[in-house]
């Protein structure tokens, strides 16, 4: 598995002219995402089957998908700061705290239970366009031209992508 991940990193670099990427390998989408986030910007982390909780439990609860500022605050109020703290909570406690769907999801994620399928290709829900400048732009007229260009690109691209 590690060799495959190394090959993927090499292919990314070759296809992009040397751009690096972090690769995470795990037994689920959750663990692959966590693994890739552990060693940025140019890392490779493999979480072997059976090692999920060892990696997951020390992390802050905010590393889990679905734990934004509001949920994190509610969890902190009941002493939950790490994923291990979350895993120590009962399902009824989490349902009472976060609601049936969200509480059940948090309960599962804290135990590295994630059966979401990996979908290689999916329908785009958004488009993006960005420009990086060598230095900060302070002239509003120059900035306005770039904004106009970006808006035009978006206006022309949306119908072709069938997003709207």
How should each PLM-predicted stretch be described?
Residues 71, 76-158:
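DNA-contacting surface of Y-family translesion DNA polymerases
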Residues 160-164:
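Single conserved hydrophobic/aromatic residue that forms the stacking wall/gate
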């Amino acid at each position: 598995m590690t060799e495959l991940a190394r090959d993927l990193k090499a292919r990314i670099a070759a296809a992009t002219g040397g751009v690096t990427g972090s690769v995470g390998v795990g037994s689920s989408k959750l663990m692959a995402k966590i693994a890739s986030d552990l060693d940025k910007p140019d890392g490779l982390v493999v979480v072997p089957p059976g090692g999920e909780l060892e990696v997951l439990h020390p992390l802050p609860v905010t590393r889990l998908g679905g734990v934004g500022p509001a949920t994190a605050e509610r969890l902190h109020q009941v002493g939950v700061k790490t994923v291990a703290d979350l895993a120590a909570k009962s399902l009824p406690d989490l349902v009472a705290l976060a609601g049936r769907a969200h509480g059940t999801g948090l309960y599962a994620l804290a135990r590295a239970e994630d059966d979401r399928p990996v979908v290689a290709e999916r329908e785009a829900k958004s488009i993006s366009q960005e420009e990086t400048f060598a230095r900060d732009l302070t002239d509003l007229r120059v900035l306005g031209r770039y904004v106009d260009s970006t808006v035009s690109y978006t206006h022309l691209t949306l119908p072709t992508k069938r997003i709207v």
